[in-house]
Amino acid sequence: MTDLRNRDARRSRWLAAAIAADLLLVVMQAVACAMYRAPHTGDAQSYWELALYCAQNHTFYPSPRDEFALYIFGNGYVNLLSLLLRIRETYVWVYAVNMAFTQLLVFSVYRIMRRLCEGREAACAAVTLLCLLPALWGEAASSRTELCFMGLAFASLACAMEDGTGWHALSGVLMALCNWVRPLMVILLPMTLLLLILRKKRLRCIAAYLLGAAAVIATIGQATKSLSGHFIYQAQTMGVNMLMGNNDDADGSYDNTVFGEGKIGYISEDERGVTYQVRDAFYKRQAVDWIVRHIPRFVQLIPRKLFYFLSTDTYGGTPYLGGGTETDNLPYLLSLRDVLLGRGERGFAFGDAVVIFSQLIYMAVLALFALDIVSAFRRGTWVRMLPFWGIFALACGIAVLTVGAPRYHMPYLPIFAMGAGDYLLAGRGGAAEPDETV
């Protein structure tokens, strides 16, 4: 009787912690949106301008005018945002979309963990840790694809774990939609199929999943073909990223100089009229040729790329410094060191505290995730987490083929939180047990 009361009390504490963490997440996202005052730059600016153009001209992306763009990216996100901007041209839609998809992500992680583990303690632990990651806080203030993609991707995984062909068809639809936002189906599709197989789903469930995805791909591709003359379903940025990470001057992160005159990615002024498809194929070919000719150098870059990919998680602090200071680069981190040592040219700011907390909580969650992998093999429960580990492993492979950047690990933060939650409850002798269907 005492054990039952203790378990109920623990369950109540974890549930309260999850609710409190989610409320904190909502509040901190709202604060980030209110504090971001600087003009948006980079991808955020590009997505916004593309969506605004589509809204004002009653068209969709990509259109014929994009045929000679550097690349096509963020297709699904741009089109969603453009539809909302036709109602009213306000950046508030960005905040609303980001916060809505964040809540979809939180609920999806909870459902996944409930299916993986008996009881809700591990699910609440995973949600608590996920909501405490400031990467999710600050991202709400920018018109980027991360939160939209993550919400759709993990909703797809959650639906795949439910019973019934309708859920699996919906999972396929959501998977295709998330890939329309960000082209990572090459990672998610095989691991979702593995998840369905490990959970002993029938062939009709797998067929429903594939048909759901195929229906969305065909619909979007055909609609784009009628608009632009080309069957375009997903972004085409692989060539650019591969070449930035694989050239003579590559250091593991971005190297934009590879596109300059005299470099292997240079396209002369006389050839500026090439389409994004031709350009993408050219960049891929140049990158592959470089890898083949410089295999030892490519291998040497692997640790650097993975270091850039996983070592820091500080980009969420940018909005809390007004948006004008990027917090995911070495110059900022050096300036923060000087501030902490009393040598800085400015005082300690709220955004600095967010950055420090972000790095600390990220490293803690990542460490718990690593411990859970070891613990799962010891407990003999590794099979249930295998598809999620596979997603992360394939993501590392993509980083090795392209470039390593801190923001690129953001879509996999929920997997880190899930592993950490599992370790806290099951790996350390808690009550969480593997799902019987696995």
Where are these regions (language model features)?
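Extracytoplasmic catalytic/substrate-binding loops of multi-pass membrane glycan-assembly enzymes
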Residues: 36-50, 56-62, 67-80, 88-92, ...
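Multi-pass, polyprenyl lipid-linked donor-dependent membrane glycosyltransferases
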Residues: 42, 72, 93-101, 125-155, ...
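Loop-to-helix entry region of an early transmembrane alpha helix in multi-pass inner-membrane enzymes
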Residues: 71, 75-83, 87-107, 124, ...
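Membrane-interface anchor segments at the N-terminal boundary of transmembrane helices
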Residues: 93, 304-388, 392
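Transmembrane-helix motifs of polytopic, lipid-linked glycan transferases
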Residues: 93-117, 367-374
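Specific aromatic-rich, kink-prone transmembrane helix
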Residues: 108-112, 148-167, 171, 175, ...
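Membrane-interface alpha helices of multi-pass inner-membrane proteins
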Residues: 127, 159, 168-182, 192-195, ...
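Membrane-proximal stem/loop segments at transmembrane-domain junctions that anchor or position
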Residues: 233-332
